[in-house]
């Protein structure tokens, strides 16, 4: 596991995949370690242009949105789908994530921001603005970038009318 973390920190993505595959073949991994390894492999796949492989790992991880890896993976999977013009699929992924819930407010907020992007892409500016306003009114943290992302997006939406 140490080799995986070192390779990831050095952005040696090929090595990350190789080490992750070896580690994942072991049956005695705890669920937490398995998630960390899968997440590292997904990140490595994504950074080497193997988005579909990354999406497979994110899909598996997103089944458990109670974990930080699962919550982030649910968001990353939907973002990947959105970026690849699978708008309806991204919306379904986000709805599943939102319905499941997560204790990780940051990633849930990012999901709502992406949902607003989906509505904007469809020309449903009012709905996008509603998502953003609701998120702005209800987001508990102020020590991250969510509020500034919301404000930027609201400003952009205001300029489109």
Segments predicted by a language model, with ranges:
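Acidic, polar-rich low-complexity tracts and alpha-helical solenoid repeat scaffolds
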Residues: 1-161
């Amino acid at each position: 596991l140490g080799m995986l973390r070192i390779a990831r920190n050095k952005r040696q993505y090929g090595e990350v995949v190789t080490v992750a595959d070896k580690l994942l073949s072991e049956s005695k991994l705890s669920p937490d370690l398995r998630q960390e390894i899968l997440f590292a492999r997904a990140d490595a796949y994504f950074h080497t242009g193997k988005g579909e492989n990354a999406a497979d790992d994110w899909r598996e991880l997103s089944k458990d949105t109670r974990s930080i890896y699962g919550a982030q993976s649910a968001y990353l999977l939907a973002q990947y789908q959105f970026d690849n013009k699978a708008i309806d699929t991204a919306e379904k992924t986000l709805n599943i994530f939102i319905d499941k819930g997560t204790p990780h407010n940051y990633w849930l907020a990012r999901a709502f921001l992406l949902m607003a992007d989906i509505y904007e892409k469809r020309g449903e500016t009012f709905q996008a603005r509603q998502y953003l306003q609701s998120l702005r009114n209800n987001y508990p943290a102020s020590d991250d970038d969510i509020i500034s992302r919301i404000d930027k997006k609201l400003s952009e939406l205001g300029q489109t009318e």
